């Protein structure tokens, strides 16, 4: 889009929208125009919601979740098992586990995964604060619920090595056949992981 066809305000809006995950310049233009066509019903309420979120939502100092209170609502929930910490890469992973409703322990969000390509090292993640939580005592088990990617597995091994010898069980989520999955539709890596994670019946 040329400078002549759009003013600096619109170009800035498009540029900012294009920084969102999964949106390129063309998609950003479509989103910007859609918002502008619905100025009163969408653009203004969205701008207000973004301003309010920026002012009120913060990262939980305990687990790394996002909320308007400190510590977050999940950390404040009574009846959860303080002795089990489930480590996830990012907040959507925490939300997914909460949505399932089967985990009743505590969480720790790393804020990503180790990545040599992206230049993300241990100091860029919440690994030190996880170790501090374990060192504070009372933790029996740390569950590594990290993504089954190369970076996720690298991070899992790194964290497991750091926690070795600290008197806690370090476990990871099972990998393999999803509920309702058919073997002939699975990739080779998933099948191999399922075979390695087999258990007695």
UniProtKB/Swiss-Prot annotation:
Keywords: DNA damage, DNA recombination, DNA repair, Metal-binding, Zinc, Zinc-finger. InterPro entries: DNA_Rcmb_RecR (IPR000093), Rcmb_RecR (IPR023627), Rcmb_RecR_Znf (IPR015967), TOPRIM_dom (IPR006171), TOPRIM_RecR (IPR034137). The keyword Metal-binding applies. It comes from the Bacteria. GO terms for biological process: DNA recombination; DNA repair. Gene3D superfamilies: 3.40.1360.10, 6.10.250.240, RecR Domain 1. A zinc finger (C4-type) spans 60-75. Residues 83-178 form the Toprim domain. One of its GO terms (molecular function) is DNA binding. Belongs to the RecR family. May play a role in DNA repair. It seems to be involved in an RecBC-independent recombinational process of DNA repair. It may act with RecF and RecO. HAMAP family: RecR. This is Recombination protein RecR. It comes from Hyphomonas neptunium (strain ATCC 15444).
């Amino acid at each position: 889009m040329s400078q002549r066809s759009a003013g600096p305000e619109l170009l800035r809006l498009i540029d900012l929208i294009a920084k969102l995950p999964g949106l390129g310049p063309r998609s950003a233009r479509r989103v910007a125009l859609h918002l502008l066509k619905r100025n009163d019903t969408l653009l203004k309420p969205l701008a207000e919601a973004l301003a309010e979120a920026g002012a009120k939502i913060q990262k939980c100092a305990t687990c790394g979740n996002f909320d308007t209170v400190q510590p977050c609502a999940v950390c404040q929930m009574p009846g959860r098992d303080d002795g089990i910490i489930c480590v996830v890469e990012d907040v959507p992973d925490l939300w997914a586990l909460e949505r399932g409703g089967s985990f009743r322990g505590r969480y720790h969000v790393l804020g990503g995964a180790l990545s040599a390509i992206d230049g993300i090292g241990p100091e860029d993640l919440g690994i030190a604060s996880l170790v501090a939580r374990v060192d504070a005592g009372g933790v029996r088990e740390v569950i590594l619920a990290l993504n089954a990617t190369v970076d996720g597995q690298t991070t899992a091994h790194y964290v497991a090595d750091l926690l070795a010898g600290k008197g806690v069980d370090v476990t990871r989520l099972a990998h393999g056949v999803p509920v309702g999955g058919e073997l002939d539709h699975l990739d080779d890596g998933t099948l191999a992981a399922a075979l390695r994670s087999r258990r007695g019946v």
